[in-house]
């Protein structure tokens, strides 16, 4: 099973642990959402697909950026500052909270040996 989770969604825990997070390979997990959009443009993916408002599709009218209260350009810049450049700013607190609160999604299941 191939995942569509990107680095932005992975770091924020913005996926379902045993739903879209259950996979065998994650080819775009290292790419921020805005990087995926850039690559899609290079690959000549139809602009209507690239411009479609990101949504988990959990309910009618649900859109990621409204739920996160930030747009993905801002989110990706902040996440790159934090995780790629170790440059933490006070206004990144909400993103760090999402990262820490979703830590369990990035851990392997515990086993009793």
Predicted regions and their residues:
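ATP/NTP-dependent adenylation/nucleotidyl-transfer catalytic domains that generate, transfer
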Residues: 1, 5-113
């Amino acid at each position: 099973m191939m995942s569509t989770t990107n680095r932005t969604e992975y770091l924020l825990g913005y996926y379902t642990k045993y739903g879209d997070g259950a996979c065998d390979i994650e080819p775009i997990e290292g790419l921020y959402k805005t990087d995926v959009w850039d690559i899609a443009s290079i690959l000549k993916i139809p602009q209507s697909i690239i411009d479609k408002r990101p949504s988990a599709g959990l309910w009618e009218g649900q859109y990621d950026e409204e739920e996160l209260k930030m747009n993905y350009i801002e989110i990706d810049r902040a996440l790159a500052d934090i995780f790629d450049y170790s440059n933490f700013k006070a206004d990144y607190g909400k993103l760090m909270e999402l990262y820490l609160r979703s830590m369990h999604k990035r851990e392997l299941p515990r086993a009793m040996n």
